């Protein structure tokens, strides 16, 4: 309602670029590494003493780690290499070389759950919310295979799904999950 896309300069490595400042809300863009796509950005939102950072599509990045330092909520995309490689093998065995190639290529420009967890730990964030889950969770028990030990690196996490939401009450340290999915 009333919003429209606006072009902005590409943020520099290690810097946040303010793209919106209104009524105490600050939205800043940051450069992320989604090679071969360039530029690619994530966003940091700050309001009344609270903050969250959404990575956008990216591989593990020291830039994210630096710019996410101390945020309340890190919303980080992640791809499970152990499962994607099984999908690669299945596509290859079925003779679908195009799909098999995609499954290998995407490993180069997405973070794994363990890499996102390491970023969250190193950045000293309050909570890690995984999103843009690859492959999607479609069967019971798949989350354990997907997370694949990353919980040992950063145990304060949620694997996102449609409808998951969080509240960060102003001027507090509370991180409250308000919905767990549809």
Model-derived segments and their meaning:
Residues 42, 48-53, 59-162:
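Cap/insert and terminal regions of metallo-dependent hydrolase folds
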Residues 2-69, 163-182:
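Core dinuclear metal-dependent hydrolase active-site scaffold
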